[in-house]
């Protein structure tokens, strides 16, 4: 979607910090020292030493802008949790920024500015961005001192974050942009097919997909879309491609990978059959609304994220400014239903690995104690209720938090979202003495199956024997370890 970047970034120069005003009788304070951060947009940006700086990246809704906002890409963070956070900590001057609005990691590093809290994707970004910056370290003793109990949080999200940390844990999971099954009731009703329910197996989904890949006059409907890259990456079977070595940080040439086992073949076969349904060709999961299709509302089922659900439901908070009319028009062709993603076998309750965002506190943060208290609040029942009420899946799942889901998003009121917290996320295991590399698993489906026409067995073997070793070698030669 087109961003209102020019105006929004210009506005960013006018007001980038929000804080509760000091009391009228407060004693005069010395002027804070500020560091300017040059950036590719040549817009003024600075961080002062009396500000606690929160920087977020890789959560798409945070990038949403509006033309009349007093700041760039701050409105979603503020609405979801920022305003409540400032209300809770009136004596803390909180400055928030989203990546590329207008600064990036390398801009901050070059200016000698270290965020006090970084909200990031622990799955792929610890090795890629945070470790090279020197912005992560084991928080175990700090969390214990601050009274942050990870045992109360989503176990799979915690385990995922641990798996990317070289000993201990580098961050605290905050929320999950969960994958759910979206379905269009209009298409189900048209072809008289029963709606999906949580606990539906892939076998049952496959049967429905074939029934719903159908024609009605000049209209062709597709039955099912599930992005194959995400299917592998958020591995529902809990499969981990790396084999243990003798070190937590093995050299590139010592990294061992296995994606050709029977378990991997079975898992890849499971989705492969959906791709073989005649005229259910994979394009994009955003076809659920319109995506690449010529007309909206012609895809019966799609696995996508909660942030996409909020957008489809019509929440202006999650829709880019200027796109509201287009979404409203497309919405006329879709009656949204929400279920959990299909399970691998009858009676199972395991969904994808969590699409987590976590809070990281750089070791060199000058406000580490304050940052820990803010993170503690963010994972408290009060903080998690605030997130959940805005259509974001929380990592603390008390009755109050779960029941609050979507209450602050009026557009979700008529949609049954009870499936959001259904089941348990798949968990990573046996990751000790492995080094995570952002492997090109996309080559399995998108290259060797969809483009080359290969079988799952061929695709897995080629990826393991050629694509992955070539990737690791190229990255290593470029001085990268991800």
Residue map of PLM features:
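Conserved N-terminal structural module of periplasmic/extracytoplasmic solute-binding proteins
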Residues: 6-16, 20-132, 145-146, 195, ...
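Hinge/lid segment of periplasmic solute-binding proteins
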Residues: 33-42, 122-178, 331-340
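Long, aromatic- and glycine/proline-rich binding clefts that accommodate carbohydrate-like moieties
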Residues: 38, 339, 389-450, 476-482
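Short helix-initiation/N-cap motifs at beta->coil->alpha
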Residues: 97-105, 200-206, 281-295
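A structural signal for short loop-to-beta-strand junctions that line the ligand-binding cleft
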Residues: 107-109, 115-116, 146-186, 220-222, ...
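Periplasmic solute-binding protein
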Residues: 130-134, 140, 155-196, 226-253, ...
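Glycine-centered hinge/linker elements that transmit conformational signals in sensory
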Residues: 209, 252-285, 341
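Extracytoplasmic/periplasmic substrate-recognition and gating elements
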Residues: 320-393
């Amino acid at each position: 979607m087109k961003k209102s970047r020019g105006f929004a970034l210009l506005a960013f120069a006018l007001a980038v910090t929000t804080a509760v005003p000091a009391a009228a009788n407060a004693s005069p304070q010395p002027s804070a020292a500020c560091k300017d951060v040059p950036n590719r947009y040549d817009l003024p940006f600075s961080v002062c030493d009396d500000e606690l700086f929160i920087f977020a990246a890789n959560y798409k809704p945070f990038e949403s802008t509006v033309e009349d906002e007093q700041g760039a890409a701050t409105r979603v963070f503020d609405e979801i949790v920022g305003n409540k956070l400032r209300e809770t900590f009136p004596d803390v001057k909180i400055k928030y920024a989203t990546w590329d609005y207008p600064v990036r990691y390398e801009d901050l590093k070059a200016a000698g500015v270290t965020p006090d809290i970084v909200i990031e994707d622990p799955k792929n970004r610890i090795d890629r961005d945070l470790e090279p910056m020197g912005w992560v370290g084991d928080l175990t003793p700090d969390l214990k001192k601050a009274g942050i109990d990870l045992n109360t949080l989503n176990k799979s999200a915690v385990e995922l974050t641990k798996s990317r940390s070289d000993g201990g844990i580098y961050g605290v999971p905050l929320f999950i942009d969960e994958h759910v099954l979206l379905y269009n009731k209009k298409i189900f009703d048209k072809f008289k097919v029963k709606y999906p329910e949580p606990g539906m197996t892939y076998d049952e989904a496959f049967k429905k997909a074939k029934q719903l890949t159908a024609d009605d006059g000049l209209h062709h409907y597709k039955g099912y879309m599930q992005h194959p890259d995400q299917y592998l990456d958020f591995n529902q079977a809990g499969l981990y491609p790396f084999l243990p070595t003798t070190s937590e940080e093995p050299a590139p040439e010592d990294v061992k990978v296995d994606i050709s086992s029977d378990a991997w073949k079975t898992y890849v076969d499971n989705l492969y059959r959906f791709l073989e349904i005649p005229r259910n060709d994979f394009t994009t999961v955003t076809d659920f609304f319109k995506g690449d299709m010529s007309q909206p509302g012609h895809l019966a089922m799609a696995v996508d994220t909660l942030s996409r659900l909020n957008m489809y439901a019509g929440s202006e908070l999650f829709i880019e400014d200027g796109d509201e009319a287009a979404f409203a028009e497309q919405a006329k062709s879709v009656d949204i239903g929400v279920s959990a993603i299909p399970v691998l076998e009858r009676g199972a309750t395991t969904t994808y690995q969590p699409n987590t965002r976590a809070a990281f506190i750089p070791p060199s943060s000058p406000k580490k104690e304050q940052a820990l208290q803010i993170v503690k609040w963010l994972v408290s029942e009060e903080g998690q209720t605030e997130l959940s009420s805005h259509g974001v899946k929380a990592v603390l799942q008390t009755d109050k938090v779960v029941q609050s889901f979507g209450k602050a998003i009026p557009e979700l009121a008529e949609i049954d979202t009870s499936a959001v917290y259904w089941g348990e996320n798949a968990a990573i295991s046996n990751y000790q003495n492995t080094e995570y590399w952002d492997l090109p698993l996309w080559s399995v489906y998108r290259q060797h199956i969809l483009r080359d026409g290969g079988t799952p067995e061929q695709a897995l073997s080629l990826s393991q024997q050629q694509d992955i070793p070539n990737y690791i070698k190229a990255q290593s030669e470029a001085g990268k370890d991800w």
